[in-house]
Amino acid sequence: MSSKGSSTDGRTDLANGSLSSSPEEMSGAEEGRETSSGIEVEASDLSLSLTGDDGGPNRTSTESRGTDTESSGEDKDSDSMEDTGHYSINDENRVHDRSEEEEEEEEEEEEEQPRRRVQRKRANRDQDSSDDERALEDWVSSETSALPRPRWQALPALRERELGSSARFVYEACGARVFVQRFRLQHGLEGHTGCVNTLHFNQRGTWLASGSDDLKVVVWDWVRRQPVLDFESGHKSNVFQAKFLPNSGDSTLAMRARDGQVRVAELSATQCCKNTKRVAQHKGASHKLALEPDSPCTFLSAGEDAVVFTIDLRQDRPASKLVVTKEKEKKVGLYTIYVNPANTHQFAVGGRDQFVRIYDQRKIDENENNGVLKKFCPHHLVNGESKANITCLVYSHDGTELLASYNDEDIYLFNSSHSDGAQYVKRYKGHRNNATVKGVNFYGPKSEFVVSGSDCGHIFLWEKSSCQIIQFMEGDKGGVVNCLEPHPHLPVLATSGLDHDVKIWAPTAEASTELTGLKDVIKKNKRERDEDSLHRTDLFDSHMLWFLMHHLRQRRHHRRWREPGVGATDADSDESPSSSDTSDEEEGPDRVQCMPS
C-alpha cells in the first residue's frame, strides 16, 4: 500500500507542480487524499486500456508504478498486454492503409509530373511568345513613329516661284517628302518574257533600257509606253545589267550577265542594234558595272571571280585587270561596284563578305593591305556568324555618303570620308533581302531618300535623315522587287522584279498614300528573317539549284552546236583578254545563292 501510495503521491505531486518521493513527509491530509488518488489512478488505467492513449501524464504515472512493486507491475503488465494487442492491430491497418495511400499518391504524382512539365513549358512558351510579340511591337512602333515636320512645303514654294525668288522649284520639289508620299503606279511597260533584272535611264531621261532573263535588251520610250528598239544581247544566260554610256549620244550600251561576259552594243540612229561584241570575260557571273560620270569610253566591271576589270573601248584589248579582291589570302566574289562621282579615281565594291571596300586606282598595291584604301562594316557584323553579303552599294550624288544593302540584314549608310573601320551613321529597317541580289538606291536630287525592294513584293522608301519609312507600295505580284531606278530630273521612279514588266511610278495621288498594312508586313519580314537565321537550309537549295542550272546550260550548249549553221557568229565578234566562253560553267554552287531570278 505504501509503495502504491508512494507512486500515487508522486504522480499527484507532479500534477500539483511539486515532486515528493518520501512517505514520511506526507501529512494526514495527504493520506486522506490517497484513496481518491487511487481511484483516479484506476480510472485512468481503465481509460488507458480502452483508448490506447499513452501520452501525457498518464504515461509518466504508469512508468513510475512499474518501478515500485512487482504486484502492481503484474497488474500493469496484464493491462499492457491488452494494450499492446490493441496497438499492433491498429498499427498494421494504419500502415497498410497508409502504404496504399502513399502508392496512390505516388502514382498520381508520377502522372501529374509530365502534365505539370507540359503546363510549365506552355506557360514559358506563352510568356516568351508574348515577350517576343511585345518586343516586336515596340520595334515596329519605333520604325513607324511620327515624322518630323517637312522642310519643303508646296504653297510657300509656289508663292516664291510666282514672285521669281525660287529658281530651283523643280529641283527642290523632286526632293520633297510630300511628292514621295503621293507616289502611285502610272503604267507598266510590257515586252519581256522573263524576269526584268536591270533598268537604266539615259542622261536626258527620255529613254529607259531594260534587260531580262529572256536574254533581250529593250530600249523604251517610257512616256509613250512603246519600245524604241529591242535586240538579242548576245549573252548566253540571264542579263543582269544594261547601261547607257554617258556622253555617247545614247549610241552605246554596256551589258553583263550570268555567263560572265561583258558586252557592248552599238545602236544606230535608225533605231536598231548594229552589233554586240564581247570586251571582257569573268570566270563567274558578273552582276554590276560602274560608269565614270563623264566618260563615253571607260567603265569598270566586277564579277564573282573577285576580279575588277577596267575597260577602255578605245584600246585594241579593251579590258585590263585592275585588282583581285581578297580578304587575307582568300578571294571575295563581288556582286556590286560603284564609282565615286566626286572623285572618279575611287570606287567601292561589295560581295560575298561583310566589308565595303574602297580602292583608289592610282594607289592599288596588292602587296599592301591587298590594295584596299579603307574598309567599312557595321561593327556588330565584323566578327559575327551571320555570313552577311553585300548585294548592292551606291554613292550619293556628291560622293560623301555610301549606301550598302546586306543580304538578310538591313541597309547601312556610311560617311565615305571617315577613316578605315568607321561605324555606320544610319540604319534602315523593315524590308527583307534574302531571295535575290537586291538593289538599293538613293532617290532625290540631293539623295534625300533611300529606296529598296523587298522579298515581300513591296517598295520601301525611307527618309534618309530620320530613317523613317515614308512610302510603302506593292511593286511586284511575283513577290520580289529587285531593281529601282530614279529618273535623273523628274520625280519618277522605275522598278522591276520577278514580274515580266517594268513599272513606272509618279506622285499623282490626290493625297498622301496611307501606309496600310505596313506594320503587318514589317512584322512578317522580321519573323521570317529571324526564323531563317535559326534554320538555314539554303546550302542544300543552292547546291541543287547550281546542279540544275549547270545541267540545263550544258544541254542548251550541246543543242546549239548540233543545229546546222550555228556556232561561229559570236566568236567572230569576241575580243576577250580573259578566259573562254565556258567559264560560266566554272561557277561553284555557292555562287547561285543570290541569283536575281
From Swiss-Prot:
Q: Which Pfam families match?
A: WD40
Matching Gene3D superfamilies, A to Z?
A: YVTN repeat-like/Quinoprotein amine dehydrogenase (2.130.10.10)
Pathway the protein contributes to: Protein modification; protein ubiquitination
Regions of biased composition (Basic and acidic residues) lie at: 65-99, 124-137
The compartments listed are:
Nucleus; Cytoplasm
Q: Where are the WD repeats?
A: 191-230, 234-275, 281-321, 329-369, 385-424, 432-472, 476-515
Place the motif Nuclear export signal on the sequence. Answer: 39-50
Q: Which InterPro entries match?
A: DCAF8, WD40/YVTN_repeat-like_dom_sf, WD40_repeat_dom_sf, WD40_rpt
The protein's UniProt keywords, in alphabetical order, are: Cytoplasm, Methylation, Nucleus, Phosphoprotein, Repeat, Ubl conjugation pathway, WD repeat
Q: Where is the composition biased (Polar residues)?
A: 1-24
- Coiled-coil segments on the chain, per record: none
Which residue positions does Omega-N-methylarginine occur at?
Answer: 204
A GO biological process held by the record = protein ubiquitination
Could you tell me where the Acidic residues compositional bias lies? 100-112
Gene Ontology terms, cellular component aspect? Cul4-RING E3 ubiquitin ligase complex; cytoplasm; nucleus
Cysteines joined through disulfide linkages:
none
Query: According to the UniProt record, where is the region Disordered?
Result: 1-147, 558-597
Asked if the record carries the keyword Glycoprotein, the reply is: no
Q: Which residues carry this modification: Phosphoserine?
A: 21-22, 99, 129-130
State if Transferase is listed as a keyword. Answer: no
Q: Which family does it belong to?
A: Belongs to the WD repeat DCAF8 family.
Tell me which PANTHER family the record gives: DDB1- AND CUL4-ASSOCIATED FACTOR 8, WD REPEAT DOMAIN-CONTAINING FAMILY
SUBUNIT field: Interacts with DDB1, CUL4A and CUL4B. Interacts with KPNA1, KPNB1 and XPO1.
What is this protein's function? May function as a substrate receptor for CUL4-DDB1 E3 ubiquitin-protein ligase complex.
What name is this protein filed under? DDB1- and CUL4-associated factor 8
- What is the originating organism of this protein? Pongo abelii
